[in-house]
Amino acid sequence: MKITESVRTVISWSASIASQALSALTLLSIVFVGTSAPITEASPTQLTREQIAIIYMLLRDSGNSEEPSLPNTNAAADYYASNVQTQVVEAICLGCHVTNGFASSSDLIFSPGAENENLEAIRSYLQLRNDDGETLLTKVTGGLSHGGGVQLSVESDGYEALAELVSLLVAEDDSSGSTSENLFFKEVLLSDAKETLRRAALILAGRLPLESELTLAASSEEGLRLAVLGLMQGEGFHDFLIRSANDRLHTDAFVNGSFSEVSDLNGLAGDRYPMGETLWALEGAIWGYRTGIARAPLELIAYVIENDRPYSEVLTADYTMVNWFTSQVFRSGVEVGSFDDPKIFAPGQNRGSVAHDDQYFSESVPGFGTRVLEHSGFIEYPHAGVLNDLTWLHRYPTTETNRNRARARWTFYHFLGIDIETSAPRTTDPVALADTDNPTLKNPACTVCHDRLDPVAGAYQNYGNEGFYRDKWGGLDSLPDTYKYPEWFDIAEPTLYREGDTWFRDMKPPGIDNAVQPSDRVDDSLSWLAEQMVNDSRFAIAAVKFWWPALMGAKALVPPEVETDADYQARRNAYRAQELQISTLASRFRSNNLNARELLTDMILSPWFRAKAATPEASDRSVELADLGVDRLLTPEELDAKNEAILGYKWDKWEDDWLGNVKGFNTALHDRFRLYYGGIDSIGIKERNRQLTSLMANVAERQALSLACGVTALDFHDNETLSDRRLFTMVEASTTPLSEKALSVDVTTGAYRDRGTHDIDLPLSAGTKEFSIRFNNDAYDEGTENDRNLYIDAVEIYRDNQLVTVIEGEDFQNTTGFSQTIYGDGTAMGGVEYVDLDGLWTPVAWNLWGTGYVSFHVNVATAGNYRFRIVAWGSDYGDGIPANMTATVGATNAADQTVGSEAIKAQIQYFHQLMLGETVSRSDPEVEAVYELLLETWQERKMHTENSHAWSSPSEECLFPRDIHQSDWESGLGRDPEQMIYAWTSVMHYYLTHFDYLHE
């Protein structure tokens, strides 16, 4: 490796500081490779921007009083004029890289004679790629599929001059501290650490972050990084990896109903895997095997990432992933999972297939398939990670005329980031289109793509149409008989086939770019291809783009093509900025030994994920900033997980132990409404809707209607204390907008003589207040006539410990503002209770004989500290449970600020954080708007006659998880004496349909 000018500059800085203890090369070694071993010509280390900056700061702060001089900012311009403009740009590059030239769609365009403009074009290209000139210098030597092929050899003077210019420009850019990325984001606001971690947790792990994780994230950028990395484990992260990888590969087509020959043990698969017969007699085993085959490539990707193995192993792994069923059939010898759980996978090798040769004998078993009786031995399968996984090969099958080109196309696309179909314009020349003389090999209109595509297709030479290894008779190749023996099919052309061939002679030989597959790698040609690909700089860039939609909610941008479009420049700016970010991420990915968890973390910490808003100055940049940051629509699966994380359960979830169900359960969002809500099936629908449509909005509305009542009623019913609740942690079901204070208490069981007292103490302002008592647990047995009732003898009111007034129970109905429960048939619940006192039936109390309330107004003449003392008792039902009442003091005007209204607003404020991830003040207009919604709903509900429950059958319903039974309803689930559960249901519906709940 040659020491670039920037390194020479650093060394000169170091040499000028005579007193420092470390030599320049030792310092470079520590920064670059973590040791004090000196860097030599053979060191693979490459200088990056960050490393130059670190070295500069170390030398600057090393004790030398003089600031080291920065590189000469005119050096690059001077050097370019003397050594590059004429000798390289005009002599070589201007042939194609000009407007309307062959390379006019590239990111590097020159103009004849425009020295300064051309230098800036190179500078911009380097900033865009952000790889210290690696792409530029590789392309001029013919690498990275350079359309112009080799233009400069590494030994040439032109290459030396261009490399030196690159070094000078990189040094200048580093010293200026300015990049085009910084400029692109100068008017963009980023999410803070806690906001970022919340989004990351919901997307990566399907859960909310823990408090400890939030604290770590808020401590520093490194803390945020560690917190994000900590999310990447467990079932939620595994689901994210499987789902996201399938969004690209679409191998779940075979999970969702597409037929797969390679997993059909009753058909072609049984023909080649003798051990498949062992599963015939096991009920359901065929489905467990199909699950194992279908999920193997996705499980391989997940295994590599979850175990911090180099991402290159996705292609180079000498194993596949097996479950209990495929381990048996593949003869893997791996103990994994069990018959009852096909979802558990482990690494294992495929050692179970056989060739069809002269030693192969089989019989057909009616109702089952093919039984292999004899065979020559088991094939030593040459694993190449995903590339020769049975499901990958079958998902992208070939034909006798396609000749593995589809497989090659998707290999380029997914693992090198190249879309062959858009890499060059398609010809419309009728002469070229009419060419039948092997145009893919000879016609320039075709070879522009096929020269690159066909060698990779050749690397798939050992795999037949369905994906089986060397599936033709004899087990020597996979070449179609129409090519080998055309005379069998009345084809006039003579055969080109020669015994021992494994590839077509009328196509490019197997290879990639300028590399040709060695003759000793024919049997494992895909393994050889994988080795070439993972060492290609494009592999890391493709990995970033592969995972980009999973995090950002949109595919990586492509360059705009029509310069006359009104938004061309804005889209071009966005594309350039994103390409710069992707190049930076890819560079870090390589330096982190292709650790995918580190890559995902870098992507999350990037401004492309964290951007949350634009400043007013960016009002004219809506097109440029359209693909940034938040407001990423959640997929059906992600919304399902968010529901469970926040609400406690998924919409209409039910368990399913069918071995063909890869999840083990079903939900409304994941199954019945998945496609309606923008999901995919990987068969006919392969692109997710990234924008909410009217149909999707209807699904979101139905989900909200199905969940809102149930989650609200259950949270109040199942958890008596606020601290135990998931949602309603600041209010009780009895807390109303008018509430000042409430007391729920069991009263003494017995008779009039056994009555007891219960106090509510609170400060009150002057004015009219409402006092209410609610009986909560009425019970009556028709057989025994046992009856639990609540009796109120009196309500005594004190101010500053001085008795102000006494309201006798028998006088409630004569008190101002009297109100009581009215049943649907118009009858009232409650009345005066008479007791035999010394032989006289005397009115002594108010009897609440059913679940319901009684209330009246109290005039508070002056502000002060008040006590409401309730004198009460209850009758015995015979079960040992005392009568329970809730006494409440409240305002009569909804406009009053009460303890209840403040608690409700605090609850709404909490919901904004919990459900939307937004931190707002209690006085925020959004909080006020939601409060008004609740207030109006509550007031309207109080006008209904059938309002003692959160729903009233048959006109209303409340849906619960399937494990909630009638007995739960009978225990009081949904009882709503204050009509607040109903009111909160409307609020929950609001949040469940909120844009920020459906997006992250």
Predicted segments with their positions:
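N-terminal export/targeting leaders of redox proteins
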Residues: 2-78, 198, 315, 333-334, ...
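Aromatic- and Gly/Pro-enriched helix-to-coil junctions and flexible linker segments
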Residues: 38-238, 242-251, 328, 491-538, ...
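Extracellular structured ligand-interaction cores
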Residues: 83, 90-93, 105-107, 131-133, ...
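Short catalytic/ligand-binding loop motif for oxyanion handling, primarily in non-cytosolic enzymes
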Residues: 101-106, 254, 455-457, 608, ...
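Substrate-binding/catalytic groove segments of enzymes
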Residues: 143-149, 421-422, 557-558, 922, ...
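His/Asp/Glu-rich metal/cofactor-coordinating catalytic motifs and the adjacent surface-exposed loops
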Residues: 177-179, 188-204, 208-209, 224, ...
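Generic long, charged, amphipathic alpha-helical segments
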Residues: 558-569
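Extracytoplasmic
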Residues: 738-893
